[in-house]
Amino acid sequence: KIKTHPTQSSKIYRPLFDIESENCKFVDDNFFECISTADLLITSASTTCMEALAIGVPVAIIGAKSQILQNPIPKTIPDDYWRICYSSSELIGFSKSVINLNENELILESERIRDSYFLLPTNENIEELIHLNHQI
């Protein structure tokens, strides 16, 4: 499935790519519905990288050597689960390596990511965040 950014319509991109098939199609579904069934997220840079990793979906960030790279993934997250790809061959290579990932290890890493980088929006957590902002 190909999901465009929420501020853009897939109708803009469909005429540019002749890839509509049963195996590859543009969708306008909710991001979380799409990512929960994905095997790999391919993006240029977004907070969706961390959201995908947190639910056990590996991430490929498309980089361009002529542009500043915006990588939202902390260095503490093993690069077995994400990769910066500067060429189609790098993307294909990473896609193939994703197939061989140990699913149990991926689940454990996604749990570690959730525990380390995400908080439930409870009143207590929100108050703590507001308090931290006042100290800055």
Functional labels for PLM-detected ranges:
Residues 1:
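Short beta-strand elements in bilobed, periplasmic/extracellular small-molecule ligand-binding domains
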Residues 4, 9-21, 47-118:
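Catalytic binding pocket for nucleotide-activated donors in carbohydrate/polymer assembly enzymes
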Residues 21-29:
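Active-site donor-binding acidic/aromatic loop of nucleotide-activated sugar
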Residues 28-31, 45-47:
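Conserved glycosyltransferase catalytic-site signature
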Residues 29-33, 37, 90:
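Short acidic active-site motifs
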Residues 36-44:
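Acidic donor-binding loop of glycosyltransferase active sites
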Residues 40, 97, 132-135:
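Residues within well-ordered alpha-helical secondary structure of globular protein domains
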Residues 118-136:
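C-terminal alpha-helical cap of glycosyltransferases
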